[in-house]
Structure formats: C-alpha cells, structure tokens
C-alpha cells in the first residue's frame, strides 16, 4: 500500500511512541529497529523496504506475550494508515496485510481477554487525560479508537463467550459515558467503534425486527464501510435493544 506522509503524521507517531513508552508496563513489547526521525528511517529507498524492516522476527513473534504484542501493534509506525481511507475496515485489513504483528495477534486464543482487560484499564487511564498536552490527548484518543475498532472485528465478536459478551457491552456503556464527559477531547469519530459494535450485534440477531428494508440496508452498508451513520438510528438501537439486553 503506497503512502505519503505529512509532517503532522510524522510528529504524531513520534509522540505516540514517546507517550506509550511512559504509560505501558508490559515488559516484552517489541522495539522496532528503526524509528521515524532517525537516519536509518530515511535511508530506506522505498516505503515497502521500510515496512519489511519493521516486521517482527519469527523467533520473537512466537515468544512475545499477547499483551506485549497488542502494545507493539499499537506502536506500529504506520498505524495511522487506518485513517488514510474512507473505509476504516479496509484500512484495518490493509494493516493486517502489511504487518505480521497484527496477523499474529488475531491468531492468539487469549486475544479477547487481553483486549477486554486493556479496554477496562482505559476507564482508569482516561482520568488523567486533562493533565496531558493537546497532542498527547490526541495520541490517547487515537489509540483508544484503534483498540475499540479491534474489538468490533468478526474474529473477536464471533468467538465471545456469553460472559465476555456481557463484559464487552457493559464496558461499552462505561466508555460512552467517558466520551460524553470528555466531549471536548473525544471527537465524534471516537463514537464510530461502539456504533459499529451495536449495529453488528443487531444485524446478527434474528429476533431483531427492522422498521423497513431501507434501514436494514443502511446498517448493512455501515458494516461494510463504517464511517458515518445517523446517530438517531444508533440511539434507537441502544435504547430499544442494547440497553434492554445488557443493562
């Protein structure tokens, strides 16, 4: 996947790495051999060669913990590629294709537990967000978005136990409150993963009755290309179905 990076993305990812290193306690995070802002980074003739150098060696990949692998993926230098397309699902699938860390992560049997635990920890981490500088707040909400988007992937949702499903939706209620309380920091884009989660849930429930075929198609299209959806529809789904089922 060909890419052109602007200075903003360059600064953002460098800062993202610095921020994550100060907030993560996982010991076996893979340290990428090249980083933006270094001579080595600029010496690569093509982006493809640079991405090849960023792959995790097989000897490391089989030993790294799922927690460490998740944090490594969240530090992948080209993680912002998820925003370089108007279809976030396609962008995420492209990240899976280009980085072996993501591919390995989604093979792990304990991925769901690790994602849920990380998601739970974010409810605590966010309490200090107002103490961060604007750029750091942006980094935090970006990682927040990516983590929530991972939780909406079919590989996760289709393998949830009943207890994990309850936990996920309970946490989603907590995170919706957080975003409302910090609406000056979280943009509307941060609502997308939870919206997608709710839509996927009702689309897979044969008992849910749609108002009309047009609404069903709109929701189906949103799953295929998650970007924008009428918030009134989401509110209706949440109030009449999600809340009744999980609260």
Q: Can you name each region flagged by the protein language model?
A:
Residues 21, 28-247:
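Non-catalytic all-alpha helical scaffold/repeat segments
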Residues 4-13:
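Sec-dependent N-terminal signal peptides
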Residues 14-19:
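C-terminal segment of classical bacterial N-terminal signal peptides
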């Amino acid at each position: 996947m060909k890419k052109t990076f602007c200075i903003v993305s360059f600064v953002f990812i460098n800062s993202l790495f610095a921020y994550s290193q100060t907030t993560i306690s996982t010991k076996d995070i893979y340290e990428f051999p090249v980083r933006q802002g270094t001579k080595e980074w600029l010496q690569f003739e093509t982006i493809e060669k640079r991405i090849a150098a960023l792959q995790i060696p097989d000897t490391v990949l089989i030993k790294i913990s799922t927690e460490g692998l998740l944090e490594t993926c969240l530090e992948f230098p080209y993680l912002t590629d998820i925003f370089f397309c108007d279809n976030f699902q396609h962008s995420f699938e492209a990240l899976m294709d280009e980085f072996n860390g993501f591919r390995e992560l989604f093979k792990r049997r304990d991925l769901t537990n690790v994602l849920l635990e990380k998601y739970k920890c974010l409810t605590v981490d966010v309490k200090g967000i107002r103490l961060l500088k604007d750029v750091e707040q942006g980094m935090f909400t970006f990682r927040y978005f990516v983590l929530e988007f991972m939780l909406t992937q079919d590989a996760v949702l289709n393998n949830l136990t009943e207890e994990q499903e309850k936990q996920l939706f309970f946490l989603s209620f907590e995170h919706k409150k957080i975003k409302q309380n910090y609406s000056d920091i979280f943009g509307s884009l941060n609502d997308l993963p939870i919206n997608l989660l709710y839509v996927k849930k009702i689309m897979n429930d044969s008992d849910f009755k749609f108002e009309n075929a047009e609404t069903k198609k709109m929701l189906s299209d949103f799953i295929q290309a998650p970007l924008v959806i009428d918030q009134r529809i989401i509110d209706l789904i949440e109030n009449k179905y999600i809340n009744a089922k999980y609260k």
